[in-house]
């Protein structure tokens, strides 16, 4: 009996030792196995500038975890890039800002062998952009658009009557109209690079003038803007979307897709706010926002994967349908909602396109003069 008990005890101890040894071995093997780090990507984009599920789709398809941050002006992005070590792998500057940042050595060239969808790009558009980026070495277009006037139909009519010049820059550049529109609120983009060329064009100058006298304090364009300054309610490059949609302002000089988003939000809210977007008859600027990779990016392969993903016709079509901005992928147009593909405020017709002008890069001296002017103007000096 005792022998049996002793044998049973020995067997139990042996099994216990075996289990402990197995656990130690298993732990050792687990510890020895390399842990695969999650692939990551840091993406810095404009606010309200991507479809709701674009990033989630990319993460699901690739297994890459995306950290997505937003900005609302080129100046904010530029400050981060020029300071260095921004931490971002993919950013979206406007083409003119991209051009001067290329000169500063901020970006690395794209590896086009990793971009199988490069063939989908609008080649005439790429030719235009090559003037800012030789051989299109550094960037590809994400979305593009125009700068125009968004206005609350009823409020503008109330302040100015039936004959309000809503099809002209006169609406916002003539003090006699602006003095009245101040009652319902006027918003301007917070960007000298966007607004000053429009003022130059309005007074009959080259919107891309290289003449320093056109940027002097007493120049025609500068005085035009100073004369309307008392009537501008706010300078901001994103808040005007909701402010216009909610009826908090009645006029916004802003970007086409933003104003169309405001229109859509007002319709969804059924709040009685009716908004229109107009490309003024005098013409306006057209701009391109680019996908580029900073020189100090840590995850360049993943950045290329996202660029390639965003050039897929089905993906970029979903983005255009959501943000109301046109894209540079012709094959996507058949996938767009009818209200977008047929809307000449989004995809301008030939007659309107003829009045559009791309912006060029300023010289450092003109940049400095513009920055100083804009600071003075905003503070009312």
Sequence positions of predicted segments:
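Sec/Tat signal peptide C-region and signal peptidase I cleavage site
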Residues: 33-37
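Mature extracytoplasmic/periplasmic domains
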Residues: 289, 294-355
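Conserved C-terminal helix/tail region of periplasmic/extracytoplasmic solute-binding proteins
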Residues: 242, 350-381
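Ligand-binding pocket segment of bilobal, Venus flytrap-like solute-binding proteins
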Residues: 184-276
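Hinge/lid segment of periplasmic solute-binding proteins
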Residues: 99-146, 165-173
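Early extracytoplasmic/lumenal segment of secretory-pathway proteins
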Residues: 38-101
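Short beta-strand->loop
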Residues: 108-119, 269-285, 294-296
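Bacterial N-terminal signal peptides
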Residues: 21-32
């Amino acid at each position: 009996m005792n022998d049996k008990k002793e044998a049973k005890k020995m067997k139990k101890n042996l099994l216990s030792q075996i289990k402990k040894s197995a656990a130690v071995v298993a732990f050792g093997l687990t510890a020895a196995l390399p842990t695969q780090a999650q692939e990551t990507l840091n993406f810095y984009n404009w606010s309200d500038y991507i479809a709701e599920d674009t990033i989630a789709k990319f993460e699901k398809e690739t297994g890459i975890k995306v950290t997505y941050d937003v900005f609302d002006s080129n100046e904010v992005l530029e400050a981060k890039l020029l300071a260095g070590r921004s931490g971002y792998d993919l950013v979206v500057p406007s083409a003119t800002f991209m051009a001067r940042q290329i000169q500063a050595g901020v970006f690395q060239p794209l590896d086009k062998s990793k971009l199988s969808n490069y063939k989908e790009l609008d080649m005439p558009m790429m030719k235009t952009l090559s003037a800012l980026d030789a051989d299109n070495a550094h960037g590809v277009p994400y979305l593009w658009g125009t700068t125009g006037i968004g206005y609350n139909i009823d409020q503008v009519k109330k302040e100015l009557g039936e004959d309000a010049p809503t099809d002209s820059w006169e609406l916002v550049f003539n003090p006699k109209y602006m003095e009245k529109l101040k009652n319902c609120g006027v918003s301007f983009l917070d960007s000298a690079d966007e607004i000053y060329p429009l003022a130059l064009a309005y007074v009959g100058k080259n919107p891309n003038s290289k003449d320093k006298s056109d940027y002097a304090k007493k120049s025609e364009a500068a005085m035009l803007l100073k004369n309307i300054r008392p009537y501008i309610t706010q300078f901001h490059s994103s808040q005007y979307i909701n402010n216009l949609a909610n009826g908090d302002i009645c006029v916004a000089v802003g970007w086409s897709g933003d104003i169309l988003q405001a229109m859509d939000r007002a319709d969804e809210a059924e709040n009685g706010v009716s908004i229109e977007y107009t490309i003024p008859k005098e013409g306006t600027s057209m701009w391109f926002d680019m996908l580029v990779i900073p020189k100090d990016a840590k995850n360049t392969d993943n950045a290329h994967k996202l660029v390639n993903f965003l050039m897929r016709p089905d993906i970029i079509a979903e983005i255009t349908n959501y943000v109301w901005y046109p894209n540079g992928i012709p094959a996507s147009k058949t996938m767009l909602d009818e209200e977008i593909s047929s809307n000449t405020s989004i995809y301008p017709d030939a007659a309107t396109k003829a009045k559009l002008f791309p912006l060029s890069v300023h010289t450092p001296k003109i940049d400095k003069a513009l920055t100083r002017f804009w600071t003075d103007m905003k503070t009312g000096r």
